[in-house]
C-alpha cells in the first residue's frame, strides 16, 4: 500500500478528482472537506467528543481503548460494510483523516484484515488543505482579466465558455446578488476554497494557461468570501465590460430568475410547495435590500411583485415581473454598478456587446 505524501501527489489528487473516503467525524467534515470526498466516519460526533475528553483526562492509551469500545460489534460491522462498499465502488480512491494519524490507519488495517488493501493520505486533510491554499496563492499570480457589466449582461455565461475561465459564482453556489441564492446550499468557507483551488489546478493543467478569465465579483459571494490572495490580484486586474441593450438584459434575467428558478423549485419540491418556495425566494431577495430602497419604495415594489406572482400563477406569464424588475434595475442595481465601475475606470480596457467582449477575450 503506497501512501501519497509529496506536494505533487497532493495536487495530482485534486486535479484527478480522486475519490477520498474521509473518516473524520461529520462535524469536522462539515467545517471543511475536499471536493471529491465522501464522509464515512470512524466515529460520530458524540463518540469523537468522548474520546477527546478521555484523551485530555487519561491519556492516549485510555482514549484508544475507549474508541475501540465505542466502535465495536454491530456498529463496527455497519461501518466496515460502508467502507468496503466505498472501496469497491472507488478502487482508485484513498483514505483520509485529519492528519493521516490513527483514524485512517485503523480503518486501513481493518480493511486489510478483510482483504482490501487501500492507500491513505499521509498528512491527511491538513496536508491537502495546505496544498489547496498554496496552489491558490501560486496560481493567483497569473494575469487576470475580469468580465464586468450590469446585472443581466451574461457575464457568468461568458466566463463559463472560456477554456481559461473559472466560474466563481458556480463554485460558490450563489450568483452574488440579493437574489443570488440557488437551490444548493453554500459550502463552508474552507470547502469553497478547496473547491476553488481544485478548479484552478484542473484548469491550469488542461492548457498552457497564460491568464485567468473571471467575473468581476465583490469580496463576498453570498456567505463565501474570495481568498485574500485572489481578491487582491482581482483589484489590480484589467476589466472588459459587457454593455448589452437593456431589453436583452431583461430577457436574460427573466429566463434566469423567473422561468428557471420557478422550474428548479417545482422540480425539487413539487408544484405546490415549489411555488411557495419560489415566491419566498423572490420576496426574500427584495427584502434583503429594503433599507437601501427605502420603506416606501420597497412596499411599492413588493406589491408589484405580489401582483406579478398572481399573474404568473394564473396565466403562466412572467411579463408582470417587469413592473418591479425594471425600476429595481434602473433605480438600484444599475446606478450601484456604475458607481462601483467609476471607481476603477482606469482598469477598463475594453467595452462592447456580449459577442464583442467574447471575441476580445479569446484574442488575449
Curated annotation (Swiss-Prot):
Its EC number is 2.9.1.3. GO terms for biological process: tRNA wobble uridine modification. It catalyses: 5-methylaminomethyl-2-thiouridine(34) in tRNA + selenophosphate + (2E)-geranyl diphosphate + H2O + H(+) = 5-methylaminomethyl-2-selenouridine(34) in tRNA + (2E)-thiogeraniol + phosphate + diphosphate; 5-methylaminomethyl-2-thiouridine(34) in tRNA + (2E)-geranyl diphosphate = 5-methylaminomethyl-S-(2E)-geranyl-thiouridine(34) in tRNA + diphosphate; 5-methylaminomethyl-S-(2E)-geranyl-thiouridine(34) in tRNA + selenophosphate + H(+) = 5-methylaminomethyl-2-(Se-phospho)selenouridine(34) in tRNA + (2E)-thiogeraniol; 5-methylaminomethyl-2-(Se-phospho)selenouridine(34) in tRNA + H2O = 5-methylaminomethyl-2-selenouridine(34) in tRNA + phosphate. InterPro entries: Rhodanese-like_dom (IPR001763), Rhodanese-like_dom_sf (IPR036873), SelU (IPR017582). CDD domains: RHOD_YbbB. It comes from the Bacteria. The active site is at residue 97. GO terms for molecular function: transferase activity, transferring alkyl or aryl (other than methyl) groups; tRNA 2-selenouridine synthase activity. Keywords: Selenium, Transferase. Pfam families: Rhodanese. SUPFAM superfamilies: Rhodanese/Cell cycle control phosphatase. Residues 14-137 form the Rhodanese domain. PROSITE patterns: RHODANESE_3 (PS50206). Gene3D superfamilies: Rhodanese-like domain. Involved in the post-transcriptional modification of the uridine at the wobble position (U34) of tRNA(Lys), tRNA(Glu) and tRNA(Gln). Catalyzes the conversion of 2-thiouridine (S2U-RNA) to 2-selenouridine (Se2U-RNA). Acts in a two-step process involving geranylation of 2-thiouridine (S2U) to S-geranyl-2-thiouridine (geS2U) and subsequent selenation of the latter derivative to 2-selenouridine (Se2U) in the tRNA chain. Belongs to the SelU family. Monomer. This is tRNA 2-selenouridine synthase. It comes from Escherichia coli O9:H4 (strain HS). The gene is selU.
